[in-house]
A protein has these predicted regions:
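P-loop NTP-binding core
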Residues: 1-256
């Protein structure tokens, strides 16, 4: 059975796209068939795999507009793993928030599009935009669960509380089975008191849904996208690669 996981946080710069790319690649490395959907108009997930995003004419934007089928928009990321696939995004997606508002059953468009292909994959990972608009609502309506990356910074808990409120609203009206897959700490620096305090603070409030894996602040993680590679191919022995492999193990275990 396929699992659809939305990776979301309305705060930017928390490691959401980094987590989307590297979790998907590590799941593929472990033999899982993975579809990664870029739902962010910045298209950083798309360019993070080396694709020229603005040269693509079949993206998630055209899928949501129902101009192309979802199968037509899927790109194999065979330079990385033969069982890893991507639905790309580019700047065209920026207009989708406004366009979707006028559509009938606008919150369910992505879910409807995924239905014919959902069972072909072990995991479908959706990289949500850093906002709680219609694109994120579509992703969460289509998802089984939400994975939340949190940067180890002072305002981490404030952003999380807003996201949890949004998830509760979607549970009430659109997707009653949606749940929080887990919270993963990113950009963790054990040398700073702030990182330690943030981890302890969030654990005190949400202990039951926090992943054991903590993603460290790692130079190689920051470098990898400029080479169009996930961390487990760019530097497979780096601390970032090891951390995302451990996170993939936890996600696989949770799916059993």
């Amino acid at each position: 059975m396929s699992r659809v996981i939305a990776i979301a946080n309305q705060k930017g710069g928390v490691g959401k796209t980094t987590t989307s790319i590297n979790l998907s690649a590590c799941l593929a490395e472990k033999g899982k068939k993975v579809l990664l959907i870029d739902m962010d108009s910045q298209g950083n997930t798309t360019s993070g795999f080396g694709f020229e995003k603005n040269e693509l004419d079949k993206t998630i934007y055209e899928v949501l507009r129902e101009e192309v089928s979802i199968e037509e928009a899927i790109i194999p990321v065979e330079e990385c793993f033969e069982n890893l696939f991507l639905i790309p995004a580019n700047r065209n997606l920026a207009g989708a928030e406004i366009e979707l508002v006028t559509r009938e059953n606008m919150q369910h468009i992505l879910k409807k599009q995924l239905e014919p292909i959902k069972d072909e994959y072990d995991f479908i990972v959706i990289d949500c935009p850093p906002a709680l608009g219609m694109l994120t609502v579509n992703a969460m309506t289509a998802a089984d669960s939400v994975l939340v990356p949190i940067q180890c910074e002072f305002y981490a808990l404030d952003g999380l509380s807003q996201l949890i409120y949004t998830i509760e609203l979607i549970q009430e009206s659109l997707n009653p089975d949606l749940y929080i897959e887990g919270v993963v700490f990113t950009m963790y620096d054990a040398r700073t008191n702030l990182s330690l305090q943030v981890v302890e603070n969030v654990k005190d409030n949400l202990k039951q849904i926090i992943y054991k894996t903590i993603i460290p602040r790692n130079v190689r993680l920051a470098e990898a996208p400029s080479y169009g590679l996930p961390i487990n191919l760019y530097d497979k022995r780096s601390s970032g690669a090891e951390a995302y492999r451990m996170l993939a193990d936890e996600v696989i275990e949770n799916a059993k």
